[in-house]
């Protein structure tokens, strides 16, 4: 009887965490060491339609999805792929996997979550070093005196995010729809941005996408030969309404910049 490995993750979502979760699940299944069970959770408002039954790479995941998180026994291993505030140590050995952060500080609750796990994995040395060096003073609510230091006390390692070279590779084969869209671009030099445009006013959205548009327009305005900015972005819903909201944001930013602006 194989040991049970329960993976709690947004495995069905069209999100960065979803893609990483699917990579982890496929690797565990291919390893064939554990009885892999998968409990799918949401990731914000991102659609949960990333898995396709007719895709063999997805079917191995779909076949292991749980309808109920209750198992016949405590899992030997629990892998929780979310932000650390949500980490739950429900297994005999618990691994937290998080993308971490893009800055130099996190909430104290992140460290509390990491300390619940036996091992924490992050995708880059920057994230590892940042989380390893963050600490907070703990103040006693009753006496208002220092009661210690809150810091990460559990093993923290880097597990880099790989790439599927069956998809991401040089090729001379392009879909008709892609060719049709690219043919609409007149500029000879183009920048490509891929990422979410999340909530927040200009300069306050998490990925700073709005400021990217602003700086691009201000940098290349009034040039005789301008580059273009191609954006593969969305809010969270991947809908027509989402697209229109993105276009309105771009329009509002460009409206506040004088000059002959790039596309």
Model-based region annotation:
Residues 1-45, 51-54:
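N-terminal subdomain of nucleotide-sugar transferases
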Residues 6-9, 37-40, 79-82, 160, ...:
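Short beta-strand segments
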Residues 14-17, 36-37, 44-49, 86-89, ...:
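Short catalytic/ligand-binding loop motif for oxyanion handling, primarily in non-cytosolic enzymes
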Residues 20-22, 27, 165-263:
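Conserved catalytic-core segment of nucleotide-activated headgroup transferases in glycan assembly
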Residues 62-71, 135-155, 243-263:
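Short mixed-charge
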Residues 119-177:
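Donor nucleotide-sugar binding/catalytic pocket of nucleotide-sugar-dependent glycosyltransferases
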